[in-house]
C-alpha cells in the first residue's frame, strides 16, 4: 500500500509515546528550495525519537542534509524527490550517530555520493558502520559552492558534530549540536568543549534567519544562545557530580 507523504506546517514533539506504531516519514517545505524531512525511530531509553534533516534544491539537483534513521525511509525520501524530477547529487552526514548516517549504506549501493568529515568516517569505522564514500578535513567545506556550506564549530554533542549553512536563505541546520531545551544523550558528548564551540557558532552565524535542530522545534538565532546556556549548565552539573564529597 502506497504511503502518503504529508506536507506539514509544524514540527512534531521530539519524543512521542513509546509503544505506538512509528509515524510515516514526513516532508515539509520550509521555503523555496528547502525542505525538512522528519523520521522516527524507537530508541532504547528515549522512546520514539523524532529526527529532522534537510533537503536543499539547487536547480534540478537535490542534496540531503543528514539521512533519516533507516535505509527504508532514506529510499522513500530519495524517491519522493526523484518522482518530482530532481536528481540526488549528494548527501552530507552531520555526525556519526545513526540518526544522521542510517541511510549511508543504501545511498552507497545506489551510487549516490555520500560525504562526511574524516573524523565522522573514523568514528563510523570504529563503530563498525558503513562509511561515507567521500570525506574532508576542512573546518569549512562547500558541498555546493556559495550554496551549501558545512562547518565544524568544535566538539559538543559528539566530537565530530557539524552544522550546515545555506547563505542565500540564511538557514542554519544545527543538527544535534543545537539543544535549546536540554543536552539530551551525553554518551559521546564533550561537555568541556561544548560551551566554547557554541560561542564559535554564535559568532559565525549570529545573523541566521532560521535555525533547524535535529530534535527540537525550529526557531531563530536565539536557539544558539540557548544551546550555549544549556552547555554551560551541563558542564557545571558534570563538575558537581564528579567533585569528591567532603
From Swiss-Prot:
GO terms for biological process: antibiotic catabolic process; response to antibiotic. A beta-lactam binds at residues 99, 179, 185. Its EC number is 3.5.2.6. The keyword Hydrolase applies. SUPFAM superfamilies: Metallo-hydrolase/oxidoreductase. Gene3D superfamilies: Ribonuclease Z/Hydroxyacylglutathione hydrolase-like (3.60.15.10). It is found in: Periplasm. Zn(2+) 2 binds at residues 99, 176, 215. Keywords: Antibiotic resistance, Hydrolase, Metal-binding, Periplasm, Signal, Zinc. SMART domains: Lactamase_B. GO terms for cellular component: periplasmic space. One of its GO terms (molecular function) is beta-lactamase activity. InterPro entries: Beta-lactamase_class-B_CS, Metallo-B-lactamas, NDM-1-like, RibonucZ/Hydroxyglut_hydro. Confers resistance to the different beta-lactam antibiotics (penicillin, cephalosporin and carbapenem) via the hydrolysis of the beta-lactam ring. Exhibits higher catalytic efficiency toward ticarcillin and piperacillin than blaIMP-1. Exhibits catalytic activity for carbapenem compounds, but has a preference for imipenem and ertapenem over meropenem. Has high efficiency for the hydrolysis of cefuroxime. Exhibits hydrolysis of all cephalosporins tested. Exhibits no hydrolysis of temocillin, the 6-alpha-methoxy semisynthetic derivative of ticarcillin. Belongs to the metallo-beta-lactamase superfamily. Class-B beta-lactamase family. Monomer. Pseudomonas aeruginosa strains carrying this gene (identified by PCR) have been isolated from hospital patients in Italy, France, Argentina and Thailand. This is Metallo-beta-lactamase type 2. The lineage of its organism: Bacteria, Pseudomonadati, Pseudomonadota, Gammaproteobacteria, Pseudomonadales. The gene is bla-imp13.
Amino acid at each position: 500500500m502506497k504511503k502518503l507523504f504529508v506536507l506539514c506546517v509544524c514540527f512534531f514533539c521530539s519524543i512521542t509515546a513509546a509503544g505506538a506504531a512509528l509515524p510515516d516519514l514526513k516532508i515539509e517545505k520550509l521555503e523555496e528550495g528547502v525542505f525538512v524531512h522528519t523520521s522516527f525511530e524507537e530508541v532504547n531509553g528515549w522512546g520514539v525519537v523524532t529526527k529532522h534533516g534537510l533537503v536543499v534544491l539547487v536547480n534540478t539537483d537535490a542534496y540531503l542534509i543528514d539521512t533519516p534513521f533507516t535505509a527504508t525511509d532514506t529510499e522513500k525520501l530519495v524517491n519522493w524527490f526523484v518522482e518530482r524530477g530532481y536528481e540526488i547529487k549528494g548527501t552530507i552526514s552531520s555526525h556519526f550517530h545513526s540518526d544522521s548516517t542510517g541511510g549511508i549504506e543504501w545511498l552507497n549501493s545506489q551510487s549516490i555520493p555520500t560525504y562526511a568529515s574524516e573524523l565522522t568516517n573514523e568514528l563510523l569505522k570504529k563503530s563498525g558502520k558503513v562509511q561515507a564514500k567521500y570525506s574532508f578535513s576542512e573546518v569549512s567545506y562547500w558541498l555546493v559552492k556559495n550554496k551549501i556550506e558545512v562547518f565544524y564549530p568544535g566538539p559538543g554533542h559528539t566530537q565530530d558534530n557539524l552544522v550546515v549553512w545555506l547563505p542565500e536563505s540564511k538557514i542554519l541546520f544545527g543538527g544535534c549540536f543545537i539543544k535549546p531545551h536540554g543536552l539530551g544523550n551525553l554518551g559521546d558528548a564533550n561537555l568541556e568543549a561544548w560551551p566554547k564551540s557554541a560561542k564559535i557558532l554564535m559568532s559565525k552565524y549570529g545573523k541566521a534567519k532560521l535555525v533547524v535542530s535535529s530534535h527540537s522545534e525550529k526557531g531563530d538565532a536565539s536557539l544558539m544562545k540557548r544551546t550555549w546556556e544549556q552547555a554551560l549548565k551541563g558542564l557545571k552539573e558534570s563538575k558537581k557530580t564528579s567533585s569528591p564529597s567532603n
